[in-house]
């Protein structure tokens, strides 16, 4: 076997690989010898079929396998000897297309190598950790929000008109073209005006109604309505108003606490404080992580594989286009060109991705089975009733596993770096933390 370098520019590599006919023949014979003990053929005992006959019968079939294995072996040996790591799957092409049995096999292999990653002294990285305490005002605000969610309704004075936010208890019958339709009627139905729980335009027409009043509400079902026989059609709902009720906030006391699973109000406040501080810590970590990535990005410089940058830039452009065009759910659109800004962001992401991968490998950072299981379960909760199917899907899908593993690995590498960096704490207000978070999104 002969390997000759044809290209070595930056990270681009090219090689010609020649596998001699004799090597191929030896590989075929090797595979025949391996299979011989199990082969049965009429006129011969099992395992006693002559090699010449086996080669005549199976040689042609094994030649393709032998060729692929020999080329794969040559590539693996090249990467082992050179230390190169291809950024993407190498491009391999047979150059003697008129090849016939008995000829040498000539193959051209090209790829982009991953760059050498420079050493990073993490002890001189300075980071700021923002600390926010859950003060009484924040706890009281959270309690007030809980009280609103636990609000009740009490009947308004007789003759009062319904306002936005009121609850209207009613019977209604819906008709399309004068005919009642299935699912279009109900009795004693409590509807909170402004909740947007009914189709657009329905609740607005009930603002101002009184108890014991009857009102016809005319609406048009959305074109994308779930029930196809109603989509886009006009309907008239005859509503008989039984009660108009105003919202009453729940009292902030031990009874409210018990509704949310706490023993008393003091215990609920303690739970809220813990939850708030966990939220603040998560936000603070996001800000510090950005600071760390900025510091690393400024600290290192190395060549980047153009193919990785190009793929990442296209992915960024595609994602941003869909965010700006949320009504398009499929990929049935023209090609989205990556801009210079997309490419600049892609270079940063690729550079940091390669650096973190290298640092994680050197630190022997691993994602445990328990961490993967937790991540899969977290994703599975988005598909109620289909958790088992989702779990099985992930187990059979290496690409999905990698999508779940990557952010866990990155966070563990970040923790590893932070543990060695110089970290100073700075206590700030909740509002200042929010501003720091918003600044991340604005960048």
Swiss-Prot record:
It catalyses: [protein]-peptidylproline (omega=180) = [protein]-peptidylproline (omega=0). Its EC number is 5.2.1.8. One of its GO terms (cellular component) is cytoplasm. It is found in: Cytoplasm. Gene3D superfamilies: 3.10.50.40, Trigger factor ribosome-binding domain (3.30.70.1050), Trigger factor, C-terminal domain (1.10.3120.10). GO terms for biological process: cell division; protein folding; protein transport. It is an enzyme of class 5 (isomerase). Keywords: Cell cycle, Cell division, Chaperone, Cytoplasm, Isomerase, Rotamase. InterPro entries: PPIase_dom_sf (IPR046357), PPIase_FKBP_dom (IPR001179), Trig_fac (IPR005215), Trigger_fac_C (IPR008880), Trigger_fac_C_sf (IPR037041), Trigger_fac_ribosome-bd_bac (IPR008881), Trigger_fac_ribosome-bd_sf (IPR036611), Trigger_fact/SurA_dom_sf (IPR027304). Involved in protein export. Acts as a chaperone by maintaining the newly synthesized protein in an open conformation. Functions as a peptidyl-prolyl cis-trans isomerase. Consists of 3 domains; the N-terminus binds the ribosome, the middle domain has PPIase activity, while the C-terminus has intrinsic chaperone activity on its own. HAMAP family: Trigger_factor_Tig. NCBIfam families: tig (TIGR00115). Belongs to the FKBP-type PPIase family. Tig subfamily. This is Trigger factor. The gene is tig.
